[in-house]
Curated annotation (Swiss-Prot):
InterPro entries: ExoRNase_PH_dom1, ExoRNase_PH_dom2, ExoRNase_PH_dom2_sf, KH_dom, KH_dom_type_1, KH_dom_type_1_sf, NA-bd_OB-fold, PNPase. It comes from Pseudomonas putida (strain W619). It comes from the Bacteria. CDD domains: KH-I_PNPase, RNase_PH_PNPase_1, RNase_PH_PNPase_2, S1_PNPase. Belongs to the polyribonucleotide nucleotidyltransferase family. It catalyses: RNA(n+1) + phosphate = RNA(n) + a ribonucleoside 5'-diphosphate. This is Polyribonucleotide nucleotidyltransferase. GO terms for cellular component: cytosol.
Length: 701
């Protein structure tokens, strides 16, 4: 196959799609280059046969950043890339979410997408290039796929408006970081963080991105027309309508009644009984359908029952209408020895959230393609199996936990104080102790409460809400505060977090086409109403950050010294600063501009370290009396230490008003004496007097 190259303009960038030169044994492979700044190789491989033992669609997406792409050698002992970084995991999810709903219903062949960043100038994020490449590789592969998709990143400035595919530098000055993906007709996925933008501004960004990435979709279609493989001859299994109708006639009413049970565990138990009865009645004997087929059809009956009830205006599974938030129970300060804690319960979803403050040395060190950087804010989300009443694997965080933790982090990050105002490292951990829908948004509310309980001076409290959608034909219902079942059975998962003033995070995943601007407007409006309701209840418990940090939190003292004194504080080979830290049990961080941060586990430890630093950096003041120690006696006087590292000379003539024959008649080494600073010459030599102390005291010095 001869290489095929397609170039197109995407905003200010030139994008090149190339296929037929690299990775030719993959089902589909595309090399994407954006302005010679970023190059990503995307491959797609699809299994020709489905695994009959799998009852789900086995799609996997792997995004990987090779260090050679940025001209770096990996760290560590083995000097090669290891397990996926958090950034790689999040980008894999970002690519997976818009493509998954576009594979046809019933397609169970394994599909693996691998996106490899092979070259980068470190100016822009390679994720958009990887998404474009995934769309193109799937489009030319012949695998059944209802694409292609386009993707774009959007920034926003009050003065200049929306900006397409910004650089890292432009993003740093932006009040919005949003990634949008979708087809020519519809938006399928949104991931964003913002600095209190309005709902209209957020919706405007989504529509702006959708308009702009039409150029991507058109270019991918042209590439597929020229280099695409024939579409697979795949057809979905013929629906067994006879079995469906028989099971629905027998169990439809009972299923409908089962979905009026408001307690999740009781509802699941009843539906489980009905499912077992259906399997027993309609399978098992020779010539009858398999148990898995009956189970699948029973699930379809559940799906249709819940959706029909909702769009026809009947109460939801737990009896609520479409706009009501489940009952809230909010507590703060629930764990006595932590720095800040909150227990946030919304219906059957509960999060125990804990905030911990640390020193600058506790910041997370990130080794990225752009270089090493420190992250002073971490938010970790844990979802143990007991939260849904199940036994399960315990271990490291999975992709879902990393994704939910990042969404919660995005939601509260904009409201954290600046590092120069509050220079602590902050770690928030959300333990999901019960779950029935929207645990990530419970984590947002709990994180805001725990941070305020810890005394972190938040700019404003933050709350989050998850919205859902059920659409049947022209009928639709937007649901506030969705349950787990409504998330699973619905057409949209739409999470919005923010303050009373504006939105700080928006995440949207849509499973169907036909989500109109009107539906998104309604969802954002209902979300605002729910968010203000939740914020009102949170503010009744703790309306603003505590004025003092927890007694368990480390004490931080900030100070500044002259830059020429830094070497004195550090000492030869770091000996001085190491001695201060060991003796006071505090930690000291010194910046090149002379800024010093002292962290102590107690106030006393931090203050002791501060006094030591002050002593080292202080200058002898002429006319001031000091208590010093005699360090050395010589024939012509005595050297007295008045400040750390600073000795002055008391000449023999300055010891007493009477004549002194020998210095040792008056002073001994190690003796403490009061001395007056008479002068400091231009070489820093200090001239002291003992005999003038009394007169200086009398004059009020």
């Amino acid at each position: 196959m001869n290489p095929v190259i397609k170039k197109f303009q995407f905003g200010q960038s030139t994008v090149t799609l190339e296929t037929g030169r690299i990775a030719r044994q993959a089902t589909g492979a595309v090399l994407v280059t954006v302005d010679n700044d970023v190059t990503v190789l995307v491959t797609v491989v699809g299994a020709k046969q489905a695994d009959p033992g799998k009852g789900f669609f086995p799609l996997s997406v792997h995004y990987q950043e090779k260090t050679y792409a940025a001209g770096k050698i990996p760290g560590g002992f083995f000097k090669r890339e290891g397990r996926p970084s958090e950034k790689e995991t999040l980008t894999s999810r970002l690519i997976d979410r818009p493509i998954r709903p576009l594979f046809p219903e019933g397609f169970m062949n394994e599909v693996q997408v691998v996106c490899t960043v092979v070259s980068t100038s470190k100016k822009t994020d390679p994720d958009i290039a990887a998404m474009i490449g995934t769309s193109a590789a799937l489009a030319i592969s012949g695998i059944p796929f209802e694409g292609p998709i386009g993707a774009a990143r959007v920034a926003f400035h009050e003065s200049t408006g929306y900006l397409l595919n910004p650089t890292y530098e432009q993003l740093a000055a932006s009040s919005l970081d949003m990634v949008v993906a979708g087809t020519s007709d519809a938006v399928l996925m949104v991931e964003s963080e913002a600095q209190e933008l309005t709902e209209d501004q957020m919706l405007g960004a989504v529509l702006f991105a959708h308009d702009e990435f039409q150029a991507v979709i058109q270019a991918v279609k042209e590439l597929a027309a020229e280099a695409g493989k024939p579409t697979w001859d795949w057809k979905p299994a013929v629906a067994n309508t006879e079995l469906f109708n028989a099971i629905r006639a027998e169990f439809g009413e009972a299923v409908s009644q089962g979905y009026t049970i408001t307690v999740k565990a009781d509802r699941y138990a009843r539906l489980g009984e009905l499912r077992d009865q259906a399997i027993a009645k309609f399978s098992g004997e020779e010539g009858q359908p398999s148990a898995s087929e009956v189970k699948e059809i029973f699930g379809e009956i559940e799906y249709r029952t819940v959706r029909e009830n909702i769009v026809n205006g009947k109460p939801r599974i737990d009896g609520r209408d479409t706009k009501t938030v489940r009952p809230l129970n909010i507590e703060v300060g629930v764990l006595p020895k932590t720095h800040g804690s909150a227990l946030f319960t919304r219906g059957e979803t509960q999060a125990l959230v804990v905030a911990t403050l640390g020193t600058a040395r506790d910041a997370q060190l990130l080794d990225t393609l752009e270089g090493e950087k420190k992250d002073p804010f971490m938010l970790h989300y844990n979802f143990p199996p007991f939260s849904v009443g199940e036994c399960g694997r315990m271990g490291g965080a999975g992709r879902r936990e990393i994704g939910h933790g990042r969404l919660a982090r995005r939601s509260v990050q904009a409201m954290l104080p600046a590092a120069d105002v509050f220079p602590y490292t902050i770690r928030v951990v959300s333990e999901i102790t019960e779950s029935n829908g929207s645990s990530s948004m419970a984590s947002v509310c709990g994180a805001s409460l725990a941070l305020m309980d810890a005394g972190v001076p938040m700019k404003a409290p933050v709350a989050g809400i998850a919205m859902g959608l059920v659409k049947e034909g022209e009928k639709f219902a937007v649901l506030t505060d969705i349950l787990g079942d409504e998330d699973h059975l619905g057409d949209m998962d739409f999470k919005v977090a923010g303050t009373a003033k504006g939105v700080t995070a928006l995440q949207m995943d849509i499973k169907i086409n036909g989500i109109t601007e009107e539906i998104m407007e309604i969802a954002l409006g209902q979300a605002l109403e729910a968010r203000l309701n939740i914020l009102g209840q949170m503010n009744q418990i703790i309306g603003q950050s505590r004025t003092e940090l927890s007694a368990n939190a480390p004490t931080m003292i900030a100070m500044k010294i002259d830059t020429d004194k830094i070497r004195d504080v550090i000492g030869k080979g770091g000996a001085t600063i190491r001695a201060i830290c060991e003796e006071t049990k505090a930690s000291i961080d010194i910046e090149d501009d002379g800024s010093i941060k002292i962290f102590g586990e107690t106030k006393e430890a931090a203050e002791a370290a501060r006094q030591r630093v002050l002593g080292i950096t202080a200058e002898a003041e002429i006319g001031k009396i000091y208590v010093g120690k005699v360090e050395r006696i010589v024939d012509f006087g005595a050297f007295v230490n008045i400040l750390p590292g600073k000795d002055g000379l008391v000449h023999i003539s300055m010891l007493s008003d009477a004549r002194v024959e020998k210095v040792t008649d008056i002073l001994k080494e190690g003796q403490e004496v009061e001395v007056l600073v008479l002068d400091v010459d231009n070489r820093g030599r200090i001239k002291l007097s003992i005999k003038d102390v009394a007169a200086a005291k009398a004059s009020g010095v």
